[in-house]
């Protein structure tokens, strides 16, 4: 199994990938470095595939990886509905990609970062 070390220890790398994957699920677009984006693409594709499976074991596996953050807040009069990133993954993203076999993300290259010249990209979910 090959992966990028990203200049971090294993626990730091896992935390970084969890954070970036959750942000991509919530916002559907992130700006990051090229190496990070290529790693996050892999984990995001795995999470969306788990969302498409939709069984209890898939939900528990996704819940163990995706952070528990607020994805959306909607108000209906006095009712306030708060959905988490995990709920968005299973309720919104999984049905959207139900007929797609893979390739849920797209990477666009942008200008290098100003401070150190690191190659930057926009990682987004395909419509």
UniProtKB/Swiss-Prot annotation:
Molecular function as annotated in GO: structural constituent of ribosome
Signal peptide range in chain numbering: none
The entry's keywords: Ribonucleoprotein, Ribosomal protein
Phylogenetic classification of the source organism: Bacteria, Bacillati, Bacillota, Bacilli, Lactobacillales
Subunit record text: Part of the 50S ribosomal subunit. Contacts protein L32.
Family: Belongs to the bacterial ribosomal protein bL17 family.
Biological processes per GO annotation: translation
GO cellular component: cytosolic large ribosomal subunit
Gene field: rplQ
InterPro entries xref list: Ribosomal_bL17, Ribosomal_bL17_CS, Ribosomal_bL17_sf
UniProt protein name: Large ribosomal subunit protein bL17
């Amino acid at each position: 199994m090959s992966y990028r070390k990203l200049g971090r220890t294993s626990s730091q790398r896992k935390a970084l990938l969890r954070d970036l994957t959750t942000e991509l699920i919530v916002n559907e677009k992130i700006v990051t470095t090229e190496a990070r984006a290529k790693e996050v693409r892999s984990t995001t594709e795995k999470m969306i595939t788990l969302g498409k499976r939709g069984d209890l074991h898939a939900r528990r596996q996704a819940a163990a990886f995706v952070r528990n953050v607020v994805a959306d807040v909607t108000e209906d009069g006095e009712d306030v509905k708060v959905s988490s990133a995990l709920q968005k993954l299973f309720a919104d993203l999984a049905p959207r990609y139900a007929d797609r076999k893979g390739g849920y993300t797209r990477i666009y290259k942008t200008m290098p970062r100003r401070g150190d010249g690191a190659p930057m990209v926009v990682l987004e979910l395909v419509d």
